[in-house]
């Protein structure tokens, strides 16, 4: 049974999938940082100094301190129950970037794969009239020469 598992785990598809998952996780963290640290601060600045990660609604006030809370960190520190729609907006933007990047990668791979596919030869040229004829033909339909 251990030998079967080793054979399964060492197949090319499983190893490729594992590498893809690890690279995908790393790419996801890069995109998250891009959204949180690079894209959203200028957008927030253009919208009047808004920090999207601090967009939240208090569902239940905390036991340690009463509302209003200026930041999500204050609300969490007070033990408040919050609906964090600003973080959700950030997650949607991250997902969109990752999905678009994957779409572009898959599109490029499909183009490479289509270029690699060689169509089987189904025709040949008649040696007498140089017309395209079926590969299995024994007589040219254009000049009626025997092949």
From Swiss-Prot:
Locations listed in the record: Cell inner membrane
What Pfam families has UniProt attached to this entry? Answer: MscL
Q: Can you provide one Gene Ontology molecular function annotated for this UniProt record?
A: mechanosensitive monoatomic ion channel activity
Transmembrane residue ranges: 14-34, 85-105
InterPro entries to which the protein is assigned, alphabetical: Mechanosensitive_channel_CS, MS_channel, MSC/AndL, MscL_channel
Q: Name one GO cellular component term.
A: plasma membrane
User: Which key words are in the record?
Assistant: Cell inner membrane, Cell membrane, Ion channel, Ion transport, Membrane, Transmembrane, Transmembrane helix, Transport
PROSITE patterns on file: MSCL
Topology term for the membrane: Multi-pass membrane protein
User: According to its UniProt record, which protein family does this protein belong to?
Assistant: Belongs to the MscL family.
This molecule's function is given as: Channel that opens in response to stretch forces in the membrane lipid bilayer. May participate in the regulation of osmotic pressure changes within the cell.
Self-association and partners: Homopentamer.
| Stated name of the protein | Large-conductance mechanosensitive channel
Please report the organism this UniProt entry assigns to the protein. Tolumonas auensis (strain DSM 9187 / NBRC 110442 / TA 4)
**Gene name on record?**
mscL
């Amino acid at each position: 049974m251990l030998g079967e598992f080793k054979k399964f785990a060492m197949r090319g598809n499983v190893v490729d999938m594992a590498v893809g998952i690890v690279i995908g996780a790393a790419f996801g963290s890069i995109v998250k940082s891009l959204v949180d640290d690079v894209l959203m601060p200028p957008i927030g600045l253009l919208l009047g100094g808004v920090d999207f990660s601090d967009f939240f609604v208090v569902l239940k006030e905390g036991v340690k301190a009463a509302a209003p809370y200026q930041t999500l960190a204050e609300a969490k520190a007070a033990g408040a129950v919050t609906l964090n729609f600003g973080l959700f907006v950030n997650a949607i933007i991250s997902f969109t970037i990752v999905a678009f990047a994957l779409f572009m990668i898959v599109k490029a791979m499909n183009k490479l794969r289509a270029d690699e596919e060689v169509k089987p030869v189904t025709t040949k040229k008649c040696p007498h009239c140089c017309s395209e004829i079926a590969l299995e033909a024994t007589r040219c339909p254009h000049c009626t020469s025997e092949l």
